[in-house]
């Protein structure tokens, strides 16, 4: 037993469709966000490589594959061009379409990939909006209570202070 640490993810991302002045500039920002997300994912993988099994570490490889997916990138760029809109809105809309399709398949493995896309979409949107994801900082051994928790958040926790996780 130990104290509960409530991870509050109630703040929502403010994703509003906005007209943009430069499509090329918005596409450049999107591509830069992809590179930053890839670098963050590689960094997390390196931090976790000694803490996780080879099988568990493969989730980061899967995340990198999603972030490098030319179809996802192309559809997002096409969305920006055809709607003359901001990249964070385009990311949200395109990934929402992908996750809806994957969840409709009813396969638990595929649904887990849909969850990965949601997490990566959130990461990209946070990068585009120049915001940071809530980090979990434990000062004493605690039980983490959350609606959901991302692999990125898990990798930032001092494992010696985690008594359990309830989602």
Regions found by a protein language model. Give the residues of each.
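Non-catalytic, soluble scaffold/interaction modules
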Residues: 1-167
């Amino acid at each position: 037993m130990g104290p509960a640490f409530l991870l509050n993810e109630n703040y929502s991302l403010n994703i509003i469709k906005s007209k943009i002045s430069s499509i090329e500039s918005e596409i450049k920002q999107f591509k830069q966000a992809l590179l930053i997300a890839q670098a963050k994912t590689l960094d997390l993988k390196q931090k976790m490589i000694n803490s996780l099994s080879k099988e568990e570490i493969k989730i980061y490889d899967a995340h990198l594959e999603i972030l490098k997916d030319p179809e996802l990138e192309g559809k997002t760029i096409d969305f920006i061009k055809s709607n003359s809109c901001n990249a964070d809105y385009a990311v949200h809309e395109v990934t929402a379409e992908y996750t809806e399709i994957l969840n409709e398949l009813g396969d638990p493995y595929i649904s887990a990939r849909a969850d990965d896309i949601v997490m990566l979409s959130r990461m990209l949107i946070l990068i585009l909006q120049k915001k940071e994801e809530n980090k979990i900082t434990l000062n004493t051994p605690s039980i983490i209570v959350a609606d959901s928790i991302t692999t990125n958040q898990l990798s930032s926790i001092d494992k010696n202070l985690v008594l359990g996780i309830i989602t």
